[in-house]
Amino acid sequence: MYKTVLFDLDGTLLNTIDDLADSANRVCAAHGWPQYETAQYRYFVGNGIPKLVERFSPADCRSPAQLAATLAEFDQVYGAHMHDKTAPYPGIPELLARLKAAGVKMAVFSNKADEFARAVVARYFDADLFEIVRGALPDVPTLSLIHISEPT
C-alpha cells in the first residue's frame, strides 16, 4: 500500500473545464475576439493559465504586455466564476475518503494559481483531507513546488 499520493487538480480531482472555458470566453467577448466551444478548450489547458491565455488570444494580441494584461483580466473573471460549474469527478470524494481511512497521506500540486487551487480544494473537499495543497506561485518554477512542501 502506498503511504502518500500526490494528485493534480484540474482534470484529475475536479472537472473545471466549463468554468475555465466560460471565463476565457468572457474575456474573448469583452475584446471582440473569437470564442471557442468548451471541447476546444480541452486542447488549450494543461500547461497553466498563462499558456491557456496565450492559446485563446489572437496571434496579433500576444505581445508580452498584451498577454500580461489578458492574464490579469482572466484571473479576475475566473476568480469570480471558478465555482459556477466546477465539481469533483464522480467517485473522487469516495476514493479520497477511502485513502484517508487507510492512513494514506495525500497532497495536491497544481499548475493553477496557488490562491485558486487552495480556494477550489477548500470549496469541494474536507479541510483535513490533504496534507498540503500548492498551486503555481509567481517567480517559482513549477518543478520547485515539490521542494516547498518539504519539511525544514
Give a label for each model feature.
Residues 104-107:
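Short active-site oxyanion
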Residues 44, 127-142:
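A short, structured active-site edge motif that brings together acidic residues
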Residues 2-9, 13-94, 102, 115-118, ...:
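N-terminal helical cap/lid subdomain that shapes the substrate entry/recognition surface
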Residues 144-152:
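Residue-level detector of conserved catalytic or cofactor/ligand-binding positions
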Residues 84, 140-145:
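Structural motif
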